[in-house]
Every structure is written in structure tokens, then in C-alpha cells.
Curated annotation (Swiss-Prot):
Organism: Schizosaccharomyces pombe (strain 972 / ATCC 24843) (Fission yeast)
Role according to the record: May stimulate membrane curvature formation and subsequent endoplasmic reticulum exit site (ERES) establishment.
GO CC annotation: endoplasmic reticulum
Record protein name field: ER exit protein
Superkingdom to which the source organism belongs: Eukaryota
Similarity field: Belongs to the STEEP1 family.
InterPro entries xrefs: STEEP-like
GO biological process: endoplasmic reticulum to Golgi vesicle-mediated transport
């Protein structure tokens, strides 16, 4: 068992299939809610996190209920695979595809986190 002080804590890092680090958060994605539309895990950006992705293009998706939504691509920095997206109409949330990212428990220094 590791000795973690006040300046660090257990977290989970998520990696793109190409091996590039994509996102680090303090809870496992499996403990977060899933969006019913596409089963993506919903990450509230208010959670302590470290984003290792780049923002891509905006695009529109037509939903089965006849509506549409504007998404913003969240891309792997290495291979540019879209591992998650954000919604223009619901800022502050990241929708992560659990089939594309691999989880690894890590220890994170508090000084590296976004506030």
C-alpha cells in the first residue's frame, strides 16, 4: 500500500487505444452516470481533473427523437481519435466513450489539477 500525503491522491487515468493519455480524474468512469442516448460516461468538469486532449471541430448530430445537438470533438493529442465530446448546449460536461479509453489507477499531485 502506498503512503499518500495531503498533496496527492488516488486517481484514474484514461488512455486512448493508441496509448496516449487522454484524461485523469479522481473517480472511476464506472462510478459516474451514463448518458442514455449513447451510454457515454458523463464527467462534470467541476470534478478535479487533468485534461490531456485537444478540442476539435463542432458538428451536428440528428437524434432519434427528431431533435439535434451540436457537439464539440475532444480528440486524442497523438492520433486525433474522438474519445469524448462536449455539448454546445450543456457546457461544463465531458461525455467519454467507455469503449475507447483504457483505465489505469494512478497517484496524482494536487498541484497538477485544474480548479
Amino acid at each position: 500500500m502506498s503512503n499518500q500525503g495531503k498533496d496527492s491522491f488516488k486517481a484514474y487515468s484514461y488512455f486512448c487505444p493508441c496509448g496516449q493519455l487522454f484524461l485523469t480524474i479522481h473517480v472511476s468512469l464506472t462510478r459516474l452516470p451514463q448518458r442514455q442516448l449513447d451510454k457515454r460516461h458523463v464527467v462534470d468538469e467541476k470534478l478535479n481533473h487533468i485534461a490531456h486532449f485537444s478540442t476539435g471541430n463542432k458538428y451536428y448530430i440528428t437524434r432519434s427523437d427528431g431533435g439535434y445537438e451540436q457537439r464539440i470533438q475532444l480528440l486524442c493529442r497523438r492520433c486525433t481519435l474522438e474519445c469524448a465530446y462536449a455539448l454546445e448546449a450543456a457546457p461544463g460536461y465531458i461525455y467519454v466513450d467507455p469503449t475507447l479509453v483504457n483505465e489505469k489507477p494512478v497517484t496524482v499531485s494536487v498541484s497538477n489539477l485544474k480548479e
